[in-house]
Structure formats: structure tokens, C-alpha cells
Amino acid sequence: MSFFSEHMPIVYQEVQNANASPGTATGLIYAWDEKNQQTDIAAAVPVEAGTKINSPIVQATNIPASKAVCVNYNGAYDKIADAYNSIRQYLAENKLKEKIPSIEQYITGPANEKDTSKWLTKIVFLVE
């Protein structure tokens, strides 16, 4: 997770510079190529609606309220694809259409817990 190690401190600093209270570390996933192990992801933190971020490298993004399918995933990140596959199977079985981005909220992880079995990631799929 070197991407997050590099970028989350910048995101947190810019949010604090805006005098806002950041929520938990979050990933916004816009594309995921499982075959090639590549993703288009943004490091993010939730902030109060209307927060103005005055930064050339960090921007505020509004994600409108939506119906969602959520899964709490416990474990190391190298097995998280199993949770995604289960969610996608559920969406297909229930004829739900996935909206972009999907959201990962890192409730516990390497920054605050060494035992990977205690890592908790909340995965949120916005749906139509």
C-alpha cells in the first residue's frame, strides 16, 4: 500500500489546512483490472459537505447519496478481491447496477494494527 503511505499524509494535511475534520482513510476506486493487478484509485477522507480545499494537488469530490451494498472485510489486503467478487455476484443475482466509484474505508489497517486478521475494511458499492 505504498500509494496510500505516500499520499494519505498529504490529503490529511490539506484537509487540516482547510480547518476541516477528516474522517477515516478512504480509497475511491474508479477502475480495477484484477488480471493485471492495476487500479485507478484516489486517496481520500470524508469531510463535511461544502468543505473548500484550496490546494493544487488535493480536491474535494462530492459523491451524491445513493443506495449501496456494503461489506465489512476483515483481513489482509491481498485477499480483498474475494470480497469484491462476492459483492459483484450479489449485484448480478439481484440485478443491481454498480456505480463508480466503489469505496473502501480503512477502519483498521497497517497504520494502527499490526495483526492483519484485525484489519477492517468497509467496502461500499453504490448501486442503481
Please provide the spans of the model-predicted regions.
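A solvent-exposed interaction/effector surface
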Residues: 1-128
